[in-house]
Amino acid sequence: SLLFWNLPMKTQDIPHIPYDMYESTQEILIIMPLGGVKKDTLSLKIEDYKLSITGERTLPEVKENLVSIREECYWGKLHQIIDLPPQIYFDKIHSKLTPENTLQIIIPKALVPEKIVVDIEE
Protein backbone atom coordinates (compact mmCIF):
# COMPACT_ATOMS: atom_id res chain seq x y z
CA SER A 1 0.00 0.00 0.00
CA LEU A 2 1.04 3.60 -0.53
CA LEU A 3 2.08 5.53 2.57
CA PHE A 4 1.64 9.07 1.27
CA TRP A 5 -1.49 8.70 -0.82
CA ASN A 6 -3.17 11.89 0.40
CA LEU A 7 -0.38 14.47 -0.03
CA PRO A 8 -1.45 17.47 -2.14
CA MET A 9 0.17 17.69 -5.56
CA LYS A 10 2.07 20.82 -6.55
CA THR A 11 1.07 22.65 -9.73
CA GLN A 12 2.80 25.62 -11.34
CA ASP A 13 2.70 27.84 -14.35
CA ILE A 14 5.85 28.30 -16.43
CA PRO A 15 8.29 29.56 -13.80
CA HIS A 16 10.86 32.27 -14.14
CA ILE A 17 14.49 31.22 -14.07
CA PRO A 18 16.23 32.60 -10.97
CA TYR A 19 19.36 34.60 -11.69
CA ASP A 20 22.05 36.76 -10.11
CA MET A 21 23.30 39.94 -11.79
CA TYR A 22 26.66 41.63 -11.25
CA GLU A 23 27.99 44.87 -12.69
CA SER A 24 31.33 46.60 -13.20
CA THR A 25 32.20 49.71 -15.18
CA GLN A 26 32.96 47.49 -18.21
CA GLU A 27 30.28 44.79 -18.17
CA ILE A 28 27.19 43.17 -16.73
CA LEU A 29 27.28 39.49 -15.77
CA ILE A 30 24.15 37.36 -15.41
CA ILE A 31 24.44 33.93 -13.78
CA MET A 32 21.63 31.35 -13.96
CA PRO A 33 21.75 27.87 -12.43
CA LEU A 34 20.15 25.49 -14.95
CA GLY A 35 20.38 22.03 -13.42
CA GLY A 36 18.51 19.53 -15.58
CA VAL A 37 18.31 21.88 -18.59
CA LYS A 38 20.08 20.66 -21.74
CA LYS A 39 21.96 23.14 -23.93
CA ASP A 40 19.96 22.25 -27.04
CA THR A 41 16.74 23.43 -25.32
CA LEU A 42 18.18 26.87 -24.45
CA SER A 43 17.40 29.98 -26.45
CA LEU A 44 18.57 33.57 -25.88
CA LYS A 45 17.01 36.42 -27.87
CA ILE A 46 17.18 40.20 -27.63
CA GLU A 47 14.31 42.42 -28.71
CA ASP A 48 13.31 45.94 -27.62
CA TYR A 49 16.04 46.15 -24.95
CA LYS A 50 14.87 42.87 -23.41
CA LEU A 51 16.85 39.64 -23.10
CA SER A 52 14.56 36.61 -23.31
CA ILE A 53 15.88 33.27 -22.06
CA THR A 54 13.90 30.06 -22.56
CA GLY A 55 14.71 26.44 -21.92
CA GLU A 56 13.25 23.16 -20.80
CA ARG A 57 14.02 20.94 -17.82
CA THR A 58 13.32 17.31 -18.71
CA LEU A 59 12.11 14.83 -16.12
CA PRO A 60 14.42 11.81 -15.93
CA GLU A 61 12.84 8.43 -16.66
CA VAL A 62 11.17 6.87 -13.63
CA LYS A 63 10.21 3.20 -13.35
CA GLU A 64 6.55 2.59 -14.22
CA ASN A 65 5.76 0.98 -10.87
CA LEU A 66 6.80 4.09 -8.90
CA VAL A 67 4.09 6.50 -7.76
CA SER A 68 4.94 10.10 -6.96
CA ILE A 69 4.54 10.95 -3.27
CA ARG A 70 6.08 14.42 -3.38
CA GLU A 71 6.78 16.81 -6.26
CA GLU A 72 8.76 19.95 -5.50
CA CYS A 73 10.86 20.10 -8.65
CA TYR A 74 9.58 21.83 -11.74
CA TRP A 75 9.90 19.88 -14.99
CA GLY A 76 9.05 21.54 -18.26
CA LYS A 77 9.49 24.91 -19.93
CA LEU A 78 11.36 27.77 -18.23
CA HIS A 79 11.33 31.44 -19.17
CA GLN A 80 12.89 34.70 -18.01
CA ILE A 81 12.90 38.22 -19.45
CA ILE A 82 15.54 40.70 -18.30
CA ASP A 83 15.42 44.42 -19.13
CA LEU A 84 18.68 45.67 -20.62
CA PRO A 85 20.05 49.21 -20.45
CA PRO A 86 20.52 51.01 -23.78
CA GLN A 87 24.24 51.72 -23.13
CA ILE A 88 25.55 48.26 -24.00
CA TYR A 89 27.12 46.61 -27.03
CA PHE A 90 24.21 44.42 -28.12
CA ASP A 91 26.25 42.76 -30.86
CA LYS A 92 28.97 41.70 -28.40
CA ILE A 93 26.80 39.90 -25.83
CA HIS A 94 27.96 36.33 -25.38
CA SER A 95 27.14 33.40 -23.13
CA LYS A 96 28.50 30.06 -22.02
CA LEU A 97 27.15 27.03 -20.22
CA THR A 98 29.58 25.73 -17.59
CA PRO A 99 30.14 22.02 -16.83
CA GLU A 100 28.06 22.60 -13.67
CA ASN A 101 25.15 23.67 -15.93
CA THR A 102 25.30 27.33 -14.97
CA LEU A 103 24.55 29.80 -17.76
CA GLN A 104 26.78 32.88 -17.76
CA ILE A 105 25.76 35.84 -19.92
CA ILE A 106 28.37 38.56 -20.40
CA ILE A 107 27.09 41.95 -21.57
CA PRO A 108 29.79 44.53 -22.43
CA LYS A 109 28.89 48.11 -21.57
CA ALA A 110 29.31 50.93 -24.06
CA LEU A 111 31.44 53.77 -22.79
CA VAL A 112 29.29 56.82 -22.23
CA PRO A 113 31.29 59.99 -21.62
CA GLU A 114 30.18 62.13 -18.72
CA LYS A 115 30.65 65.35 -20.67
CA ILE A 116 30.95 66.12 -24.38
CA VAL A 117 31.83 69.50 -25.82
CA VAL A 118 30.11 70.14 -29.15
CA ASP A 119 31.69 72.63 -31.55
CA ILE A 120 29.48 75.26 -33.14
CA GLU A 121 30.04 75.76 -36.86
CA GLU A 122 29.84 79.19 -38.48
Segments from the language model and where they lie:
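Alpha-crystallin/small heat shock protein
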Residues: 1-122
